[in-house]
């Protein structure tokens, strides 16, 4: 795929995606994952240790919008892949940071943006998460540095999907 070795994950929860990402980057790769909730970070840390991948994962606890400037200052980018699965209301800011910490070819994935199928395309729906998902999709479409699309998923959890974009310059 994109042969990512340096990955940024925004939103860790229990570390399920983190474990898959850490396996994918291989022994020489690194995943930096940002989690707001210390309890979730502890659960993720335990799961990552159980998976014997702790040497590939750096868990940072706190608000992602506070952690991202520190990551930039520490020059830990550019990242090959940025996976965003956190508070939907800040997705546009997370994509801005993903762009700032990227290089041409970086893949940016924003999870859970389809929001029940037709909800995102319905301007009469006033739910904050739906409005945030709509905003990030519009941002990706308008950003000249990104080529992206939304992909719908349907399964036992219902109708949702994700946006995937590639940095082109």
PLM region spans:
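S-adenosylmethionine/decaboxylated-SAM
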Residues: 1-169
């Amino acid at each position: 795929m994109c042969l990512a070795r340096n990955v940024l994950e925004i939103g860790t929860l229990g570390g399920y995606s983190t474990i898959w990402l850490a396996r994918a980057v291989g022994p020489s790769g690194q995943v930096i994952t940002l989690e707001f909730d210390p309890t979730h970070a502890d659960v993720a840390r335990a799961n990552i240790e159980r998976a014997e991948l702790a040497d590939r994962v750096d868990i940072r606890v706190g608000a992602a919008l506070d952690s991202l400037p520190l990551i930039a200052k520490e020059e830990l980018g550019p990242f090959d892949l940025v996976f965003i699965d956190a508070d939907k209301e800040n997705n546009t800011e997370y994509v801005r940071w993903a762009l700032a910490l990227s290089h041409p070819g970086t893949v940016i994935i924003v999870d859970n943006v389809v929001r029940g199928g037709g909800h995102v395309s319905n301007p009469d729906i006033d739910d904050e998460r739906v409005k945030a998902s709509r905003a990030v999709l519009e941002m990706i479409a308008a950003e000249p540095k990104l080529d992206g699309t939304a992909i719908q998923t349907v399964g036992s959890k219902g109708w949702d999907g994700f946006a995937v974009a590639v940095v082109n310059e």
